[in-house]
Regions:
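Short, conserved beta-strand element in jelly-roll/cupin
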Residues: 59-62, 71-87
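Hydrophobic h-region of N-terminal signal peptides that target proteins for export
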Residues: 9-17
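A short, N-terminal "cap"/entry segment at the start of jelly-roll beta-barrel domains
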Residues: 16-55, 137-152
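Sec-dependent signal peptide recognition
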Residues: 1-8
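Ligand-binding loop in jelly-roll beta-barrel domains
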Residues: 99, 108-132
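Short beta-strand His + acidic residue motifs that chelate non-heme Fe in jelly-roll/DSBH
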Residues: 67-69, 87-88, 106, 111-117
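Short acidic-glycine-tyrosine-enriched beta hairpin
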Residues: 49-51, 62, 85, 90-109
């Protein structure tokens, strides 16, 4: 089984203490790519420690950036902040176009795909340590290299 965790973010970002308030502009976030995710996607940790538990991440990507079919161990909630995105659900075949304020929730192990239809930013919230498991067309787990090397 191939599992990508967000542990690498601990080296890039300083997690906020739970008892501290914070307010910052989008331009003050420190975005960075993460191994195991498409190079087009960059992340900034807003709260929590995604390698250890519940967290909120701000994801940013250019038009056409695709995070291919995958699932997570935690429940994931996504809210688009800017631009437009498409969220596709494998089990229902549902594809939803979301603009600012658009919301999607994927329960644990729910296979989905996320695409920035235009340059987009979205909050990604998870209720436990964040991971990503890529799947092939039949739903079998595949290594990130295989998922990310496919032409979109």
């Amino acid at each position: 089984m191939m599992k990508i965790t967000i542990a690498a973010l601990g080296c890039i970002f300083v997690a906020l203490a739970d008892d501290m308030g914070v307010a910052r502009k989008m331009s003050e976030n420190k975005f960075a790519p993460l191994p195991g995710l498409p190079a087009c996607a960059t992340l900034a940790v807003e709260s929590g420690d995604p390698s250890k538990g519940a967290s909120v991440i701000l994801l940013k990507g250019p038009a056409g950036c695709v995070i291919p079919w995958h699932w997570h161990t935690p429940t994931e909630q996504v809210m688009v902040v800017s631009g437009s995105a498409k969220v596709e659900m494998r089990d229902t075949g549902q594809a939803s176009s979301l603009g600012p304020g658009g919301y999607a929730m994927m329960p644990s192990k729910h296979v989905h795909q996320f695409t920035c239809a235009s340059a987009c930013a979205a909050f990604v919230s998870s209720d436990a340590a964040f991971d990503i498991h890529y799947v092939d067309a039949k739903g079998g787990e595949i290594p990130p290299e295989a998922a990310l090397s496919k032409k979109k």
